[in-house]
Structure formats: structure tokens, C-alpha cells
Design a protein with these regions (language model features):
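N-terminal, membrane-interfacial amphipathic/helix-forming hydrophobic leader that caps
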Residues: 1-76, 154, 209-225
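Small-residue packing motifs within transmembrane alpha-helices
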Residues: 5, 12, 17, 49, ...
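Transmembrane helix-loop-helix hairpins at the membrane interface
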Residues: 20, 107, 116-225
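Residue-identity detector for glutamine
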Residues: 32, 83-85, 192
Length: 225
């Protein structure tokens, strides 16, 4: 079993590497999907950020979950136990994600900007894997290890600080990420599983991003010409 120093040292080490990857992506102007759609970034930079998150956070999650003997129920979905309130939250997340995407500004129709044919499907697949690993790290390993060591209140507070710091580079997400973080932590604690947080996060993020891509389908068509 890992000591406290080793456990939190690993968490901070891999978290810092991921934070550095995010900062680099934002500095290069390609940290988010909207940067690609508005001609401010390159797909490669966005994929680099996502893959870095999968690698760094995934490696940390695998190492700590194995050495700290976290109960398998934390990482196992229990579909029959999920109550109506959770499905209502998921539905609300989809609606909010879709509505927020409808307010985004897109390139003009006469823009010469185009996206590679592989981009939509590959982005959705990589993004889905990223969000699952992301929640395994934040609402799985970090949250439940800290609850065991430090108690619920401290664990949630630290989780929110780490989570909000990831979103600090986008001033539109800074404060919303705190609210989202509270919801995701509470859902995970209530069900003693990371999967409710995964479902809520996937529902909000993917509905938003898929709608953005659909609204920009003309960019995909241009790549045929």
C-alpha cells in the first residue's frame, strides 16, 4: 500500500503534467473544439491535449487504484441502482449542452476554412475516452482516496480546486466548473461510484460538442472539394 506522501506525490506529479499539456495547448490556440471550428487552432494540438490527459491521468489512476486497494464498486457501473433523479440530471445536462452550443459563433459560409474528414468521428471517440479517464481520476481516485484519508468536506474542496484550475484557462468556464464539480462530486459520493459523474459529464460535453460539429458540417463538406 502506498504511503500518504507517495500517493499525493503521484497525484500532484501527473496532475501537473496534464496541467502543463493544457497550458501548452491553450498557448498554441488549440485547446478546445471551438478553436478548431473558428480557425484559431489545429486539430493536432487538440488531440495532443486529449491524448496527454488519457495517458497521464490514466497512468496515475491505474497506479493508485491498484496500490491503494480502492473498492472495485467505485469503478463499476450499477445501472439498476441509478434513480430517476440521476436520469433527470443527465437529461438536463443534454439540454443545457445543446442550448449552450447554439449560442456559439461559427465561421461565415464563405470561409475557406475546412476540417479533415476524419475529424468528427475521431474527435468524439477520443473525447469520450478522455472524459471517462478524466472522471476516473478526479471523481474516482482523487475523490475517494481523499475521503478515506481526509474526510468528505476536505476531499470535495480539494477536488474542486484541482478541477477548477484545469478550467482556469477559459474565463467562461472558471466559475461554471465549480458548480459542475460540486454536482459530479455529490453524484459520485451518493452512489459510491464514478459512473454517475461520467454519465453526467459525457451528456453535457458531448451534446455540446456534437451540436457544434453539426452546425459546422459545411466545414467537413468543404474538405471534399
Amino acid at each position: 500500500m502506498l504511503s500518504y506522501i507517495t500517493t499525493y506525490g503521484l497525484i500532484l506529479f501527473y496532475y501537473s503534467l496534464f496541467l502543463l499539456a493544457i497550458a501548452t495547448a491553450y498557448k498554441s490556440g488549440g485547446g478546445q473544439l471551438k478553436d478548431i471550428l473558428t480557425e484559431k487552432g489545429e486539430p493536432g494540438i487538440l488531440f495532443m491535449r486529449l491524448i496527454a490527459g488519457i495517458f497521464f491521468l490514466g497512468l496515475c489512476t491505474a497506479t493508485i487504484s491498484a496500490k491503494r486497494n480502492i473498492t472495485s464498486e467505485v469503478f463499476t457501473p450499477a445501472w439498476c441502482e441509478y434513480q430517476t433523479q440521476l436520469w433527470a440530471l443527465i437529461a438536463a445536462a443534454i439540454i443545457m449542452g445543446t442550448l449552450s452550443a447554439s449560442k456559439e459563433i461559427f465561421p461565415a459560409e464563405n470561409s475557406k476554412h475546412s476540417l479533415p474528414l476524419y475529424f468528427p468521428l475521431s474527435f468524439i471517440l477520443v473525447r469520450t475516452l478522455f472524459l471517462i479517464v478524466y472522471e476516473f481520476f478526479f471523481r474516482g481516485v482523487v475523490l475517494f482516496v481523499m475521503i478515506e484519508d481526509l474526510g468528505v468536506i476536505t476531499a470535495v474542496m480539494v477536488n474542486l480546486i484541482l478541477y477548477a484550475s484545469i478550467h482556469w484557462f477559459d474565463n467562461r468556464e472558471r466559475y461554471g466548473s465549480v458548480i459542475m464539480g460540486i454536482i459530479l462530486c455529490e453524484a459520485s459520493i451518493y452512489y459510491q461510484s464514478v459512473w454517475p459523474a461520467i454519465l453526467i459529464h459525457l451528456s453535457f460535453a458531448l451534446s455540446h460538442e456534437i451540436f457544434l460539429i453539426i452546425n459546422n458540417k459545411s466545414l467537413i463538406k468543404k474538405s471534399w472539394s
